[in-house]
């Protein structure tokens, strides 16, 4: 058998395998396979990246369900917020030992006080009128080298447990995406997916670790040159300087990060004021050296309160690693005085 014939058979086998995979993919993911997403098997996009996949406005004539409520978060009534809280409390977490226990303000505060309005979709049972599905989009700034974009971060995607398996989540996502595109002209949205990875090319992949805070012993400082400072409304200038520094470094290609996604300064200070997030600065000789970001996720595990560390950033790149770790332990000590947190959730992302 000559080499040309062998190559033809190899090409034929690869082609058949690829076609069969496409059929499997469309059957396995009937909703996602129709969405403008970068997939691993998108060979053309792998070789010649096109950037934004869908630049033109989507066709809304057949894909918009007007019975799905779509509005700005600031326009929600008190009853709508209460209904949303009830849905999330009963259905947001997947396991029985997990409980999501927010108040009305804990939910809405993450969606307001932003330059670009956050929007929300509500899916109601057509017979009973109960709220059985929801999703929100809130805008964050994505900064990469020579790229600065507003991206819609998708959150609170939740469907009542008794109504799952009916593609309600898919309908909410599609409706929300189309309406958002026509409202803001934004074409980039960010999803956070937990668990088994789907065949989409992710922006990043990271692990999340759980720790018992009782295992962290109290740190006793023996010198005064190094300490931890909680960011409040009186010293938010340090946070502003950090955001400015991060943006300048990545735009000048001198950053340790390839990509930064952050909330605008105005919204961060609002969350600090409402005590939804706690940001600590490691101070040495009156100068910031590192920052530690914690979020109250209003979630308990076996009735134990948890706190989430979602970012740890060096302000000075040459800071000693031992000092960076010491600052983290000092921040943990401070958090224990704020509330009775028992579990630390650490996102290994920065």
Residue spans for each PLM region:
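Short, low-complexity, Lys/Arg-enriched N-terminal segments of secretory-pathway carbohydrate enzymes
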Residues: 1-4
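Conserved acetyl-CoA binding element of GNAT-fold acetyltransferases
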Residues: 149-161, 302-319
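An N-terminus-focused feature that recognizes amino-terminal "leader" regions
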Residues: 6-223, 229-245, 252-269, 290-293, ...
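Extended, charged low-complexity segments
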Residues: 283, 294-315, 325-331, 346-350
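Short, flexible loop/turn motifs enriched in small residues
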Residues: 287
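Ligand-binding pocket scaffold of soluble enzyme catalytic domains
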Residues: 318-323, 335
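Beta-propeller domains
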Residues: 274-281
């Amino acid at each position: 058998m000559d080499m040309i014939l062998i190559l033809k058979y190899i090409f034929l086998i690869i082609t058949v395998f690829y076609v069969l995979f496409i059929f499997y993919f469309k059957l396995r993911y009937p909703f996602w396979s129709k969405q403008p997403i970068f997939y691993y098997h998108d060979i053309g996009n792998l070789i010649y990246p096109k950037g934004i996949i869908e630049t033109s406005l989507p066709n809304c004539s057949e894909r918009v369900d007007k019975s799905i409520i779509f509005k700005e978060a600031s326009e929600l009534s008190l009853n709508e917020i209460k209904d949303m809280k009830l849905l999330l409390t009963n259905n947001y977490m997947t396991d029985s030992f997990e409980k999501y226990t927010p108040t009305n303000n804990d939910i809405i505060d993450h969606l307001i006080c932003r330059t670009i309005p956050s929007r929300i979709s509500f899916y109601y049972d057509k017979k009973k009128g109960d709220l059985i599905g929801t999703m929100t989009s809130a805008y964050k700034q994505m900064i990469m080298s020579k790229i600065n974009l507003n991206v819609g971060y998708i959150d609170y995607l939740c469907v009542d447990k008794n109504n799952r398996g009916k593609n309600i989540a898919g309908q909410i996502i599609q409706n929300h995406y189309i309406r958002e595109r026509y409202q803001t002209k934004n074409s980039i949205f960010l999803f956070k997916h937990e668990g088994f990875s789907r065949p989409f090319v992710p922006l990043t992949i990271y692990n999340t670790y759980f720790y018992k805070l009782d295992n962290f012993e109290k740190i006793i400082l023996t010198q005064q040159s190094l300490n931890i400072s909680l960011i409040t409304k009186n010293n938010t200038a340090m946070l502003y300087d950090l955001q400015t520094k991060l943006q300048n470094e990545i735009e000048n290609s001198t950053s340790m990060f390839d990509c930064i996604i952050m909330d605008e300064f105005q919204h961060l200070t609002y969350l600090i004021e409402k005590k939804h997030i706690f940001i600590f600065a490691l101070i040495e000789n009156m100068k910031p050296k590192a920052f530690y970001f914690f979020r109250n996720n209003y979630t308990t595990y076996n009735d134990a309160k948890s706190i989430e560390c979602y970012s740890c950033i060096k302000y000075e790149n040459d800071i000693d690693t031992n000092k960076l770790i010491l600052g983290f332990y000092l921040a943990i000590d401070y958090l224990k005085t704020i509330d009775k947190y028992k579990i630390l959730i650490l996102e290994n992302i920065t």
